[in-house]
Amino acid sequence: MKITVKEFQLLKSAPNSAYKAIMPEFLNHSNKLEGSTFSEDELVRLALDGKVQGDHSIDDVMETRNSIDVFGYVIDTLGQPTSEGFLIALNEMLFRGTSREAAGWTGHYKELANRIGGSSVQVALPSDIPTAIPELLAAYPDGSSSFEDIADFHVRFEHLHPFQDGNGRIGRFLMFKQCIESGVDLIVIDDENNDPYKAWLELAQTTGDKRFFYDLLHQCQTRFDAKMDALGVTRLIDDLHKSGQKPKRQRLGELQGEMTKASEQLNADAQRSHDHRSDHDTPDEDDR
């Protein structure tokens, strides 16, 4: 499924749109990959009603709530440069109000060497990050990435692991953003692919062999498309593509502008007509 920048931003602004199905599908799986205990229904309830259902830790509640805000921020800023400041903003937003924030571990690059849990991959050291991240961002210009470029960026970003925590979620947010901006079918990692995702990512990072990782991402694209089709979302997106209509608010503004110009023209014509009649109605000296 491909959705353009303008289309996605329009969906976000519209009530009862496909956005309300795509957002929880992405977040539910991305968060579960990091241990969240929220079900998709519970996440939707939190997103739409602001109510928490189920038994969850305070940090899980806050991070899940924050992930909804981060998703919205990513959509709002589509088309803007992926800068270091943008990455840091995502990390700060994701952990706002959590114990990680209180301990001072968020809103900046990592200060202590870290690792990927359950992996033998040796990630970058804190001293590497100030140079490595700018190089990574420069190597993959915004809006011009192929499927392979996006996958390669993800492999490299996760290998750098620039933050003390939250790298997986931020990496998947970036992958989603890149897909939209570059016209690539959306990649949503399903939590049911947790083990192969981590295994093939590790293989790509340690050996440079990315074939299996590419295959997995293609499978995730196909699986996501099938889910959206079952929910009726594909039909909505196809109609959006076909219509090519401008957002109604934009069109309404244009119509109002046209009406204002027409009204001004009518007033001007009426004034000229009045002035013309006045000239003809003025009595001659002999008639006075």
Regions found by a protein language model. Give the residues of each.
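FIC/Doc superfamily catalytic core
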Residues: 1-165, 169-288
